[in-house]
Structures are given as C-alpha cells and as structure tokens.
Amino acid sequence: MQERTPPARDDGCTRTALFRRAAAGGAVVAGGALLGARRGNGTSLAAPTADTDAKILNFFLLLEQLQEAFYREALRRTRPAGALGEFARTVVRQESEHVAFLTERLGSRARARPKPDFGDALSTPEQFRAAAIDLEETTIAAYIGQGANLTRDAIGAVGTLLSVEARQAAWVLDLAGKSPAPNAADPAQGSGDIVAHLRRQGYIT
C-alpha cells in the first residue's frame, strides 16, 4: 500500500504549548481515558499523592526517552524515506518535547536516560515501522494503565501527551495500511507488564 502523509497541521507540541494546555486542564478526552483506567488492567492505588505522581511520571519519562532514542536512531540507521521518513522526523521532535516537559515537571526527581538496545528492530524500514507501531501502542497502554493513580493536576498534564501519542499511533498504523483507529477503546496495562514487554523486545535490561 502506498504510504500517505496526513494533512499538514500545527502539532501544538512546543513545550510552551504543552504547559499552557496542561495548566488549562486540556486533553479532556485523553484525561477521561486516564480517569477511566480503574476499569482496565492497570494497577489502581487508593489515593494519588505527589509521591505517586513522581513515580508514575518517571515511568512515563522512561517510555518517552525510549521513544525519542528509537526515532533518533532510526533516522541515523534505518534512514526511512518518503512518508515514513516524515513520520519519523516529526515524531522525534515531539518525543523530545515530551521528554523535556516531563523532565522539567519532575525537576530533581527526574530519572537518568536509559541506554536502550533496539537491535534488529531498525534493520529495515518495514521492521522500523512494525516496531514503531508496537512502541506507540505500548506507551498508550501504559498511560491508560497508570492514569487512575495520578492526581488530577498530573492527569491534566499527562493528558496532553497521551493525545499526541494516540495521533502518532494512528499515523504509523495508516502508513502500514492498517486501520488508524481499530478499537472503540484502547486497553490498559500495568507498569510491570509494560516493563516485561520492553525487556522481551530487548530494548531495556
């Protein structure tokens, strides 16, 4: 199937825009998905606190750091062309903003960058595309799975990131000739399942 690039649009993903939208309690739909995660497979804690926020946001930071490294290395190693290349160039910029946003929010609590190993996932454009789908969908499941454990302030901030992750997933699914929105509701996964999956993929140890 011929790869298609979605219509040009303002991605609204500068750090200033992210903070403005977070402060306004933006991403209502994504925030609703996070609040509704208690009905999914995520682990729901009794009462969200600032400490649990820091732990969960660091988990999300790990995922965003992995994605940024993945797309940056893909541009260097795989060198995707055409619409797939445009996707990779756009998403690496967005993931870089996500990393900066979470790092600034966490301050001194922010985790160090991991040293991922993407192995054969970047051997060919086709393998890169398949791995990108998996990584985007894994990140979305993680956000939904931990959403109910965040304070409302953190949900408002994280919702602005989740909505962008969903658009990224839809974009790369479309490039692969698949439905960009195959389900009425996305599944949730707990952090333990997410980390185990990333280890099986060989991305982290």
Task: Tell where the protein language model's regions lie, with residue ranges.
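All-alpha RGS (Regulator of G-protein Signaling) helical domain and cognate RGS-like helical scaffolds
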Residues: 2-14, 23-205
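Hydrophobic/basic alpha-helical segments enriched in Actinobacteria
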Residues: 18-19
